From Swiss-Prot:
<comment type="similarity">
    <text>Belongs to the FGAMS family.</text>
</comment>
<feature type="binding site">
    <location>
        <position position="121"/>
    </location>
    <ligand>
        <name>substrate</name>
    </ligand>
</feature>
<dbReference type="GO" id="GO:0006189">
    <property type="term" value="P:'de novo' IMP biosynthetic process"/>
</dbReference>
<dbReference type="InterPro" id="IPR041609">
    <property type="entry name" value="PurL_linker"/>
</dbReference>
<dbReference type="GO" id="GO:0005737">
    <property type="term" value="C:cytoplasm"/>
</dbReference>
<comment type="subunit">
    <text>Monomer. Part of the FGAM synthase complex composed of 1 PurL, 1 PurQ and 2 PurS subunits.</text>
</comment>
<feature type="binding site">
    <location>
        <position position="96"/>
    </location>
    <ligand>
        <name>ATP</name>
    </ligand>
</feature>
<dbReference type="GO" id="GO:0000287">
    <property type="term" value="F:magnesium ion binding"/>
</dbReference>
<dbReference type="GO" id="GO:0004359">
    <property type="term" value="F:glutaminase activity"/>
</dbReference>
<dbReference type="Pfam" id="PF02769">
    <property type="entry name" value="AIRS_C"/>
</dbReference>
<comment type="pathway">
    <text>Purine metabolism; IMP biosynthesis via de novo pathway; 5-amino-1-(5-phospho-D-ribosyl)imidazole from N(2)-formyl-N(1)-(5-phospho-D-ribosyl)glycinamide: step 1/2.</text>
</comment>
<dbReference type="InterPro" id="IPR036676">
    <property type="entry name" value="PurM-like_C_sf"/>
</dbReference>
<dbReference type="InterPro" id="IPR010918">
    <property type="entry name" value="PurM-like_C_dom"/>
</dbReference>
<feature type="binding site">
    <location>
        <begin position="317"/>
        <end position="319"/>
    </location>
    <ligand>
        <name>substrate</name>
    </ligand>
</feature>
<dbReference type="GO" id="GO:0004642">
    <property type="term" value="F:phosphoribosylformylglycinamidine synthase activity"/>
</dbReference>
<dbReference type="InterPro" id="IPR010074">
    <property type="entry name" value="PRibForGlyAmidine_synth_PurL"/>
</dbReference>
<dbReference type="Pfam" id="PF00586">
    <property type="entry name" value="AIRS"/>
</dbReference>
Length: 742
């Protein structure tokens, strides 16, 4: 494409060509006012990506301000590539979650793969070595051929990238619901480790310092990816396949090692990933954060395609690229390091003091824009908010307990629901043991990695039950944070902080904006009560397909610290004779449950309630008991209720069973009341455990007969099943659905 084909400034305005880039009439008028002139094609392209929701958070900034972002351990909150939390001994953990939803709907393999690559770069751009990847995935019903295709390709893309780069994929979640039929969610989280003195920022400081481009060459892939991520999916979205990037994990591995070596060199001033909006966002953001400007000569940009225009180079989202700022005169030191890895490192510009992004191409100035206008001064919209009509109706609807004729069959049926069923088919494709630090592999409440050279370990998880958020976004937001914390606690860790991925529909619809506001209120309250500040994250809006929105899905990524590896706990029962306890009472709460979805085919009613103070006291008591060595296993009660949680606890390599007595009718086994745990304890610790965890109720014991037996207080048998049979249906459900041609 040659420059001659680009429309003139006048054409852009008169024909409203800017609208095709997602810029509104009001925004164009504001741009004209800021510049005091009409923007050219490259400039309006740059504004369009920087002012997209994906880059500017223009619709969500008022919401994000609600989150608590500071704490005594927080070293870096929102605003950089990733958040950082102190874990003692001069070490810190770096983590962030990001979405790649729209690209994954079109090109599921590359969309998912580049989502993993992008979040890994965010973490190592802070100076940290990535140690783990997690993912949170949502798809439509697994009976649909298209959903099967998306599911298989997304998992293959995550595995293909993560396995090749040598970072273990240690956890995550997959849920299936019809609301994600046309718009799957692919959220990737990366966790890294760093020493305090190695922390780097994405800032272009020091007038005259050199701006260097490192990594892969620039192509035409991913142009307008950020804009594409800021609009609804529709039947015409297939035409935007070129907005999907293509990843090369082997290049990323080299880039990772080279960047970590460069970080040890004091010639490095600033470093940032070329993520969404590529060269545009990295240059404008680095300059704006430092109060400086950047001038670049685009003729010097390494290109893998011929005849690329300034517009294409600045908006490309080609992968595996970083922008560095280096002390002037020390460029060769950096070039030599990248040479070792057979990577390009090219000086393409310098830092200025005029707060402008100035670009030259073929001897002409093709862009001259104020960096603050691009990075910080995008318009912020306070969208109208309106409670949906269904909300009041749900709030006043108490869902009666379903009549269950055969609890045995109901348990088996629930264990085969794809959201509950074993995800072994997924994580068997991931290398979760590479680098040999993984202590708790996928399949328990949280992934756990040891920190070499110390007694410490890190627990990590992602969580969100979007059905609860659909019923009541504020309550659902609280539950999402609380469940993530429960998973961390069950692993023997103290929750440290949160990274959140806010996946919602179109914020221009008042009912959707209401969901976002209320969910943020719930998340904020839970983070305050549980002392887990939000240190960064991502907003993904416009998750709609042909006008239908996904369920509100604010995914919570959480990391916890295990002070001593002796405290590491998993969900599985350990030996016959151990006592089984449930912590927390079970109420008849079936709205939004897996049981309701399976038996009625729809979700309605009043969401399960949560008392955050009670939640906190139970979590603290359980963690105290774990640290004192009283607890053999711990598992949080979530989808499918107590029946499913106990069944999952008996599925071990040993042929264990459990004999349990509970109060109430069979349906209560599948209620999804909150703030509950299933715990096993050695008999000799019974008194000490009960004194520590006052809410714990002794309900039975672990047996050696391989049978799960559950009866009510009258001795009436509700469940009597071989644990190996339960495990067979649980593990076989997803492979069986994928093989069927339905």
């Amino acid at each position: 494409m040659s420059l001659l084909l680009e429309p003139s400034k006048e054409q852009i305005k008169e024909e409203k060509l800017y609208q095709q880039m997602g810029v509104s009439d009001d925004e164009f008028a504001l741009i004209e006012s800021i510049l005091g002139r009409l923007p050219n094609y490259t400039e309006i392209g740059i504004f369009s990506v920087m002012w997209s929701e994906h880059c500017s958070y223009k619709n969500s900034k008022p919401i994000l301000r609600k989150f608590p972002t500071s704490g005594e351990r927080v070293l870096q909150g929102p605003g950089e590539g990733a958040g950082i939390v102190d874990i003692g001994d001069n070490q810190a953990v770096v983590f962030k979650i990001e979405s790649h939803n729209h690209p994954s709907a079109l090109e599921p393999y590359q969309g998912a793969a580049t989502g993993v690559g992008g979040i890994i770069r965010d973490v190592f751009s802070m100076g940290a070595r990535p140690i783990a990847v997690l993912n949170s995935l949502r798809f439509g019903e697994l009976t649909s051929p298209r959903v099967k295709y998306l599911f298989e390709e997304v998992v293959a893309g995550i595995a293909g990238y993560g396995n090749c780069i040598g970072i273990p994929t240690v956890g995550g979640e997959v849920q299936f619901d019809s609301s994600y039929e046309g718009n799957p969610l692919v959220n990737a989280m990366c966790v890294g480790l760093i020493n305090h003195e190695d922390i780097k920022k994405g800032q272009a400081k020091g007038v005259g310092n050199t701006v260097m481009y490192v990594g892969a060459k620039t192509g035409r892939d991913g142009i307008h990816g950020a804009t594409f991520a800021s609009e609804e999916m529709s039947d015409s979205s297939e035409e935007k396949r070129s907005a999907v990037q293509v990843g090369d994990p082997f290049m990323e591995k080299l880039l990772l090692e080279a960047c970590l070596e460069v970080i040890q060199c004091d010639a490095l001033v600033g470093i940032q990933d070329m993520g969404a909006a590529g060269l545009t966002s990295s240059s404008a953001e680095m300059a704006s954060k430092a109060g400086s400007g950047i001038e670049m000569n685009l003729d010097l940009i390494p290109q893998r395609e011929t005849g690329m225009t300034a517009y294409e180079m600045m908006l490309s989202e080609s992968q595996e690229r970083m922008l560095l700022v280096i002390e002037r005169g020390r460029e060769q030191e950096i070039i030599d390091i990248f040479d070792k890895y057979d990577l390009e490192a090219v000086s393409v510009g310098h830092v200025t003091d005029d707060k402008m992004l100035r670009l030259t191409h073929k001897g002409e100035v093709v862009c001259e824009l104020p960096v603050d206008a691009l990075a910080e001064e995008a318009p912020v919209y306070h969208k109208p908010s309106q409670e949906p009509a269904y909300y009041r109706e749900f709030l006043e609807t108490d869902v009666p307990a379903p009549q269950i004729e055969d609890a045995n069959e109901m348990l088996k049926a629930l264990l085969q629901q794809p959201t509950i069923a074993s995800k072994e088919w997924v994580y068997d494709q991931y290398d979760y043991m590479v680098r040999t630090n993984t202590v708790v592999a996928p399949g328990s409440d949280a992934g756990v990695l040891r920190i070499r050279g110390t007694k410490k370990a890190l627990a990590m998880t992602t969580d969100c039950n979007a059905r609860y958020l659909y019923l009541d976004p504020e309550v659902g937001g609280k539950i999402a944070v609380a469940e993530a914390a429960r998973n961390i606690i069950c692993s023997g860790a103290e929750p440290l902080a949160v990274t959140d991925n806010l996946n919602f529909g179109n914020p221009e619809k008042p009912e959707i904006f209401w969901q976002i506001e209320k969910a943020a209120d719930g998340i904020s309250e839970a983070c305050n009560v549980l002392s887990t500040p939000v240190i960064g994250g991502n907003v993904s809006l416009y998750n709609e397909s042909n006008g239908t929105a996904i369920y509100p899905t604010p995914v919570i990524g959480m990391v916890g610290l295990i002070e001593d590896t002796a405290h590491i706990t998993t969900q599985h029962f350990k030996q016959a004779g151990d006592l089984v306890y449930v912590i927390g009472e079970t109420k008849p709460e079936f709205a939004g449950s897996e049981l309701q979805k399976m038996t009625e085919g729809r979700i309605y009613g009043k969401a399960p309630q949560i008392d955050l103070d009670v939640e906190l006291s139970r979590q603290k008591a359980l963690l105290d008991a774990i640290k004192k060595g009283f607890v053999q296993s711990a598992h949080d009660v979530s989808e499918g209720g107590l029946g499913v949680a106990i069944a999952e606890s008996v599925m071990t390599t040993e042929n264990l069973g459990a004999n349990v007595t509970v109060e109430g009718e069979a349906a209560l086994l599948f209620s999804e009341s909150q703030s509950r745990f299933v715990v096993s304890v050695k008999k000799e610790h019974q008194a000490a455990f009960e004194a520590t965890v006052k809410d714990a109720v002794h309900i039975g014991e672990v047996t050696a007969d391989g049978i799960l037996a559950i009866q009510n207080q009258d001795g009436q048998q509700m469940i009597h099943a071989q644990t190996k049979e339960l495990e067979r249906v649980w593990k076989g459900a997803i492979p069986c659905l994928l093989k069927s041609k339905a």
